Amino acid sequence: MPTWGEILGEFQPPNTPDSIRRKYLSQLASHVGRDVILYSTKWTDPSNVPPDVISITEEDVQGFMEVVHGLKNDKLDLILHSPGGSPVATEAIVKYLRKKFTHIRVVVPQGAMSAGTMLTCAGNSIVLGKHSFLGPIDPQFILQTQLGNRMVPAQAILDEFEMAKSECKDTHNLGPWLPILSQYGPGLLIECKNAIALSRKLAGDWLAQYMFSGQKRATHKASILARTLADHKKYKSHGRHLSRDDCRQLGLVIEDLEQDQILQDLVLSVFHASTITFNQTPAAKIIENHNGRAFVKLSGGIRLPVQVQNLPLPQAPKIPVQPSQAPAPALS
């Protein structure tokens, strides 16, 4: 299995980040006999990239349109590395991909959190390594507080409001609660309930329609699994890592990345090449197919669509340093 440092060793002139990444994407497609799309973002590397650049957004639909163009197969391997983002943007992506592909296998080389996990639920199966993880899908809200913007779980807002109702029956408790309650805008509680319901519905519908298709009581099984993934009270933190064993125990259809050594080598080579691209170029999000068509979002928000030119390769460091793998929060 190639390491990050071994792939870094290939990043020497005349090679470019694009040529190395695309070499392994092409080899991967040849090995699996399916179309391959990479969706990877710079979310596990320390940076000052704005969250909306690395999150799943409506703009990503354009990226997928770019890379789906010209693909002939009806089967897709989607390599996914994402902190999550907008559930409704994720829904748009799923609807688009499912118009084209009858079978989608989602390969997670490291992490797919939140709405990224929701996207995996739209696959027929999920490929995870020993080190791979998914996460809870409970929705989050960004609230403006006296301490600045904070990302707060929707369920925590609802629970806190119920706590306030109970404690404020004693009017002596109104004083401490007023600054907290004043931060809640009009309609927030309804929005929280709707967001939770939407996450459950989207994940449940996709699981029933695709992953559990043909199984007995598929809808019931999918509904229970979706509710579990969206249960903030169960996981306590939106950033919890659900391992391969955790996901299999929940009932997700999981394939082991290590079952096919060539597949593992190629997937991780693509993944390492993408993370090194993020380290050595301004790229912060890459949507790319095995034919070299790409939609690249730079850290400054600039987009580079269609057969993106090779990004310049700076002088490679003499001593490889493993990039940090700390996760970042997402909207859902």
Language model feature labels by segment:
Residues 1-332:
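Terminal-region recognition feature
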